[in-house]
């Protein structure tokens, strides 16, 4: 499978192009996808790139003055609902990429032995728990053509951003998630 030239996770064609062509942007977008609308979370890497004034680079972000990075995240508009904590988490994520993957986000998945190894690597990243890691395995497999053996077993088996093919799907997914949450609450789960 050839990777797409766009991932339709935002209203911005430029941001959608960045997500499809820059693995660090995609990983940061996934990191930001919590307690914040999906389309805004995945627009965050474009805002960050614009404010940094150059392509996203893990080494540069990891070395950035944290107070300065927090200001960049504050905007306006803010890159995330919690700009200070997400600036720190983004910096921590980039530091791990520098320390363990030579600063190349693609090394995270290109050198994974299989889907289980990829999942384990993602879960070790700052801000990536079990659920977010499984969703990202799904994004890589379903949208980007990154399919190490066993990726389907490691990917999320519930509706997620990995299932979004058009921007309208973002709203459909949001409604499905609300219904799932309501059903879970009603069942006492």
Where are the predicted features?
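Short helix-capping/linker segments at secondary-structure and domain boundaries
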Residues: 34-43, 97-103, 144-148
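Amphipathic alpha-helical interaction segments
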Residues: 26, 43, 47, 88-92, ...
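Structural motif
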Residues: 14-25, 36-37, 80-85
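C-terminal accessory module of base-excision DNA glycosylases/AP lyases that mediates lesion recognition
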Residues: 1-16, 21, 113-124, 130-189
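Short, aromatic/basic-rich helix-turn unit that serves as a nucleic-acid recognition element
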Residues: 27-31
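Short acidic alpha-helix initiation/capping motifs at coil-to-helix transition points
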Residues: 20-23, 38-41, 48, 112-114
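Alpha-helical ds-nucleic-acid-binding substructure associated with the helix-hairpin-helix region
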Residues: 48, 52-124
């Amino acid at each position: 499978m050839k990777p797409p030239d766009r991932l339709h996770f935002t209203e911005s064609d430029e941001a959608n192009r960045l997500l499809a062509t820059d693995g660090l942007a995609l990983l940061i977008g996934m990191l930001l996808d919590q307690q914040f609308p999906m389309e805004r979370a995945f627009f965050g890497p474009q805002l960050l790139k614009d404010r940094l004034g150059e392509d996203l680079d893990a080494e540069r972000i990891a070395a950035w003055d944290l107070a300065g990075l927090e200001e960049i995240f504050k905007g306006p508009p803010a890159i995330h609902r919690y700009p200070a904590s997400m600036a720190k988490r983004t910096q921590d994520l980039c530091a791990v990429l520098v320390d363990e993957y030579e600063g190349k986000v693609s090394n995270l998945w290109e050198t994974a032995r299989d889907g289980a190894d990829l999942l384990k690597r993602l879960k070790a990243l700052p801000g990536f728990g079990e659920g977010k890691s499984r969703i990202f395995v799904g994004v890589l497999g379903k949208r980007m053509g990154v399919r190490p053996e066993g990726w389907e077993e490691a990917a999320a088996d519930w509706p997620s951003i990995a299932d979004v093919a058009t921007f309208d799907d973002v709203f459909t997914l949001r409604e499905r998630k609300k219904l799932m949450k309501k059903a879970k609450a009603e069942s006492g789960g």
